[in-house]
Amino acid sequence: MALTSNVIGDIGEMEVSTRLMETGLFIVFLLGGKVPAFDLLAEIVPDTNAQEKPYQFLIQVKSTDDANPFTQADHRLKTPVLNDKLNALIDRPLPSYIAGVDLNTSEVYLVPAFDRGAGYGGSIPDTFRLVKGNRAANTALLQLLKNDVIDYWRGLDIDVYKPSFHSAL
Protein backbone atom coordinates (compact mmCIF):
# COMPACT_ATOMS: atom_id res chain seq x y z
CA MET A 1 0.00 0.00 0.00
CA ALA A 2 1.39 3.39 -1.00
CA LEU A 3 1.88 6.06 1.62
CA THR A 4 -0.15 9.25 1.32
CA SER A 5 1.66 12.55 0.91
CA ASN A 6 0.63 13.56 4.44
CA VAL A 7 2.12 10.39 5.92
CA ILE A 8 5.31 10.87 3.88
CA GLY A 9 5.53 14.41 5.25
CA ASP A 10 4.89 13.30 8.83
CA ILE A 11 7.57 10.61 8.65
CA GLY A 12 10.00 13.15 7.21
CA GLU A 13 9.30 15.57 10.07
CA MET A 14 10.03 12.81 12.58
CA GLU A 15 13.30 11.93 10.82
CA VAL A 16 14.43 15.57 10.83
CA SER A 17 13.48 15.95 14.49
CA THR A 18 15.45 12.84 15.42
CA ARG A 19 18.56 13.86 13.48
CA LEU A 20 18.53 17.36 15.01
CA MET A 21 18.03 16.14 18.58
CA GLU A 22 20.34 13.11 18.58
CA THR A 23 23.41 15.07 19.74
CA GLY A 24 21.68 17.17 22.38
CA LEU A 25 22.41 20.47 20.61
CA PHE A 26 18.77 21.16 19.73
CA ILE A 27 15.25 20.51 20.86
CA VAL A 28 12.53 20.35 18.21
CA PHE A 29 8.89 21.25 18.68
CA LEU A 30 6.38 19.41 16.52
CA LEU A 31 3.59 21.82 15.74
CA GLY A 32 0.89 19.23 15.19
CA GLY A 33 -0.91 21.14 12.47
CA LYS A 34 -0.44 22.66 9.07
CA VAL A 35 1.50 25.93 9.13
CA PRO A 36 1.79 27.55 5.70
CA ALA A 37 5.50 28.35 5.78
CA PHE A 38 7.25 25.87 8.08
CA ASP A 39 6.88 22.49 9.73
CA LEU A 40 9.17 22.56 12.75
CA LEU A 41 10.31 25.06 15.34
CA ALA A 42 13.72 24.21 16.77
CA GLU A 43 15.69 25.73 19.60
CA ILE A 44 19.31 25.57 20.65
CA VAL A 45 19.90 23.80 23.94
CA PRO A 46 22.06 26.49 25.55
CA ASP A 47 25.51 25.73 26.87
CA THR A 48 25.35 27.67 30.13
CA ASN A 49 29.16 27.72 30.37
CA ALA A 50 29.27 29.61 27.06
CA GLN A 51 26.40 31.92 28.10
CA GLU A 52 24.35 30.80 25.10
CA LYS A 53 20.68 31.60 24.66
CA PRO A 54 17.93 29.24 23.48
CA TYR A 55 17.84 30.85 20.04
CA GLN A 56 15.13 29.51 17.75
CA PHE A 57 14.91 28.69 14.05
CA LEU A 58 12.37 27.34 11.56
CA ILE A 59 12.49 24.32 9.28
CA GLN A 60 10.41 23.48 6.22
CA VAL A 61 10.54 19.70 5.64
CA LYS A 62 10.24 18.16 2.18
CA SER A 63 10.21 14.36 2.00
CA THR A 64 10.23 11.71 -0.69
CA ASP A 65 9.87 7.95 -0.81
CA ASP A 66 10.61 7.86 -4.55
CA ALA A 67 12.78 4.88 -5.55
CA ASN A 68 15.03 7.29 -7.49
CA PRO A 69 15.05 10.38 -5.26
CA PHE A 70 18.01 12.21 -6.87
CA THR A 71 18.41 14.09 -10.11
CA GLN A 72 20.80 12.33 -12.48
CA ALA A 73 22.72 15.38 -13.66
CA ASP A 74 23.81 16.91 -10.36
CA HIS A 75 22.60 14.50 -7.65
CA ARG A 76 20.13 16.86 -5.98
CA LEU A 77 17.26 15.52 -3.88
CA LYS A 78 13.98 15.75 -5.80
CA THR A 79 12.04 17.52 -3.06
CA PRO A 80 11.05 20.81 -4.69
CA VAL A 81 10.34 23.92 -2.66
CA LEU A 82 8.00 26.17 -4.59
CA ASN A 83 8.90 29.87 -4.67
CA ASP A 84 5.79 30.93 -2.73
CA LYS A 85 6.69 28.47 0.07
CA LEU A 86 10.33 29.57 0.06
CA ASN A 87 9.35 33.25 0.15
CA ALA A 88 6.86 32.66 2.97
CA LEU A 89 9.57 30.90 4.97
CA ILE A 90 12.10 33.66 4.30
CA ASP A 91 9.52 36.29 5.35
CA ARG A 92 9.51 34.88 8.89
CA PRO A 93 11.93 36.86 11.10
CA LEU A 94 13.61 33.74 12.49
CA PRO A 95 16.52 32.01 10.77
CA SER A 96 15.08 29.44 8.40
CA TYR A 97 16.20 26.21 6.77
CA ILE A 98 14.85 23.52 4.50
CA ALA A 99 15.35 19.84 5.25
CA GLY A 100 14.95 17.34 2.44
CA VAL A 101 14.41 13.75 3.54
CA ASP A 102 15.04 10.56 1.57
CA LEU A 103 12.75 8.10 3.34
CA ASN A 104 14.53 5.16 1.67
CA THR A 105 17.68 5.84 3.71
CA SER A 106 16.36 8.20 6.41
CA GLU A 107 19.03 10.70 5.33
CA VAL A 108 18.33 14.39 5.88
CA TYR A 109 19.75 17.15 3.68
CA LEU A 110 19.86 20.68 5.13
CA VAL A 111 19.98 23.92 3.17
CA PRO A 112 19.64 27.54 4.30
CA ALA A 113 16.52 29.50 3.40
CA PHE A 114 17.64 33.12 3.46
CA ASP A 115 18.03 33.88 -0.25
CA ARG A 116 14.96 34.24 -2.47
CA GLY A 117 17.08 33.27 -5.46
CA ALA A 118 18.29 30.01 -3.89
CA GLY A 119 16.74 27.92 -6.65
CA TYR A 120 15.17 25.04 -4.74
CA GLY A 121 12.16 24.88 -7.08
CA GLY A 122 13.06 21.52 -8.58
CA SER A 123 15.38 19.97 -6.03
CA ILE A 124 17.74 20.72 -3.17
CA PRO A 125 21.52 20.16 -2.96
CA ASP A 126 22.88 17.16 -1.09
CA THR A 127 25.87 19.03 0.37
CA PHE A 128 24.89 19.04 4.06
CA ARG A 129 23.78 15.50 4.89
CA LEU A 130 22.75 13.99 8.21
CA VAL A 131 23.05 10.20 8.14
CA LYS A 132 21.03 7.89 10.37
CA GLY A 133 23.36 6.09 12.77
CA ASN A 134 26.39 8.32 12.09
CA ARG A 135 26.28 10.59 15.12
CA ALA A 136 29.97 11.50 14.93
CA ALA A 137 29.69 12.90 11.40
CA ASN A 138 26.33 14.50 12.14
CA THR A 139 27.74 16.34 15.16
CA ALA A 140 30.09 18.42 13.00
CA LEU A 141 27.27 19.50 10.67
CA LEU A 142 24.89 20.20 13.55
CA GLN A 143 27.56 22.34 15.22
CA LEU A 144 27.76 24.37 11.97
CA LEU A 145 23.99 24.78 12.08
CA LYS A 146 24.12 25.85 15.73
CA ASN A 147 26.84 28.41 14.97
CA ASP A 148 24.81 29.69 12.02
CA VAL A 149 21.75 30.26 14.20
CA ILE A 150 23.80 31.95 16.94
CA ASP A 151 25.51 34.21 14.39
CA TYR A 152 22.13 35.20 12.95
CA TRP A 153 20.68 36.24 16.31
CA ARG A 154 23.83 37.94 17.54
CA GLY A 155 24.00 39.86 14.27
CA LEU A 156 20.59 41.33 15.09
CA ASP A 157 21.85 42.37 18.53
CA ILE A 158 18.64 40.96 19.99
CA ASP A 159 20.18 40.60 23.45
CA VAL A 160 20.58 44.38 23.64
CA TYR A 161 17.38 45.33 21.83
CA LYS A 162 14.83 43.18 23.65
CA PRO A 163 15.59 44.35 27.22
CA SER A 164 15.40 47.98 26.07
CA PHE A 165 12.19 47.61 24.05
CA HIS A 166 9.33 49.79 25.33
CA SER A 167 6.08 47.92 24.95
CA ALA A 168 2.85 49.80 24.36
CA LEU A 169 0.99 47.34 26.58
Walk through the language-model features, giving the residues of each.
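Mixed-charge (Asp/Glu-Lys/Arg
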Residues: M1-P36, L41-L169
